[in-house]
């Protein structure tokens, strides 16, 4: 992959995360943290939906040539997100709090309104 392709993909990902934050806020989610990183993984968005802590993975694509965006949340990726979520919960002393894993899939076709699919409870805690 060329460096400009990587930069374009990073920019697309950042745009997708900004779109997802606006989408979630519009649905009364409280954004707690963005881009939480630890040695075992990363969580794009951590939010609250009422009393539930929601760990959100955002996937953005320009087209579906390689399948829908959510298809890239593989079992391996789910394990990484789960480990990062457990780390975050432990750091905040919230291991007993209700939590779930959502995916926000965004298709950002050229010059078009983004197509957003919010998949609640997209996967279970994975080890």
Curated annotation (Swiss-Prot):
Entries under InterPro entries matching the protein: Restrct_endonuc-II-like, tRNA_endonuc-like_dom_sf, UPF0102_YraN-like
GO molecular function terms noted in the UniProt entry: nucleic acid binding
Transmembrane intervals: none
Pfam families in UniProt: UPF0102
Listed Gene3D superfamilies: 3.40.1350.10
CDD domains in the record: PoNe_Nuclease
The name this protein goes by in its record: UPF0102 protein Gura_3756
Organism (species): Geotalea uraniireducens (strain Rf4) (Geobacter uraniireducens)
């Amino acid at each position: 992959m060329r460096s400009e392709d990587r930069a374009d993909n990073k920019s697309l990902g950042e745009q997708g995360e900004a779109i997802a934050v606006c989408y979630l806020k519009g649905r009364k989610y409280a954004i707690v943290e963005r881009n939480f990183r630890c040695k075992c993984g990363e969580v794009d968005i951590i939010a609250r939906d009422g009393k539930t802590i929601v760990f959100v993975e955002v996937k953005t694509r320009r087209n579906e040539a390689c399948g829908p965006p959510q298809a890239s949340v593989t079992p391996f990726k789910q394990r990484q997100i789960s480990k990062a979520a457990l780390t975050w919960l432990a750091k905040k002393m919230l291991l007993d709090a209700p939590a779930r894993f959502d995916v926000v899939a965004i298709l950002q076709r050229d010059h078009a309104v983004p197509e957003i699919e919010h998949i609640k409870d997209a996967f279970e805690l994975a080890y």
